[in-house]
Amino acid sequence: MMKWTNIAKMALLTGAAGVVLAAAGCGGDQAASSAAESGKKVVKVAHTAYYFPYDFVDDNNKSDGLEVAVMKEVEKKLPQYEFQYVPTSDDDLLIGVESGKYDIGTKGIWKTPAREKKYIFPKNNIGASVIGVTIRSEDANTIKNLDDFAKAGKKLVPIAPQNAQYQVVTDYNAAHPDYPIALEASENFEIADAYSWVLEGRYDGYFAIELSYQKNVTAKDAPYGQFKDKLTYFRYKALPTYALVNKKETKLAEEVDQALGELKKEGKIAELEKKYFGEELDLLLDKQ
């Protein structure tokens, strides 16, 4: 199992993104040359450089993470291709896959109607992420799940409409018209003060992936580590994460999807989930 205490270390890669991308550029030239010699088609696979443990760059400047590891297993099943792994930013990945700069992208992404208009989503997911709510520890005895939160009339930190989490809450409200959660739209995708707002009582909960809570509250040297006794987290559900494929690469998308399906049946994805997360994330999906 990958150590969560390494999250802070991986976050430092954000500041070194320029160095990482420069190194990736050199590697890209070498990969293209190698593929040309072997007759294989190069597939550019972009991934976020610092989203530990999904997609990141390790201490040796090598692409790593659950989704990268799964894609490397996919590559083994597709000998006609040579995958070139390119660490990059979220924005460059999304724009790059849409424009064709990259063929595939991985960033722990969920499927939404808006995204399906821009990218091909393989039928088989590549992983999963757990989403839930950070609340004050003093509320933990009465609020144990999202239904409790909603029925108590608690307020969530605002969520940007373009954030997939906004759709998750919208779907919850549609399924629970008798006690919907008040959903306030934010102009900003990331809310830097979210944990502070919960601590202060300005809002009662922060709806985010479990990884965010671990990185910001429970990990070693976490920004809000001094408040870990005042905050707690409950899970709502797990959502499948997918590889994004450029809209024109229909054949590639079908081949990747088939490979992912085979890896699931073989138990390889479950094995990698245990390695990077310590549990089988797909089992959480089955419980929903």
Q: What function would you assign to each model-found segment?
A:
Residues 49, 127-132, 220-257, 279-288:
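Periplasmic-binding protein-like
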Residues 84-95, 183-196, 200:
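Short helix-initiation/N-cap motifs at beta->coil->alpha
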Residues 108-118, 167-171, 199-237:
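A ligand-binding cleft/hinge motif common to bilobed small-molecule-binding domains
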Residues 35-109:
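Extracytoplasmic small-molecule ligand-binding "clamshell" domains
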Residues 84-149:
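Acidic, polar ligand-binding/catalytic clefts
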Residues 49-52, 63-75, 132-190, 210-212:
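Bilobed "Venus flytrap"/periplasmic-binding protein-like clamshell domains
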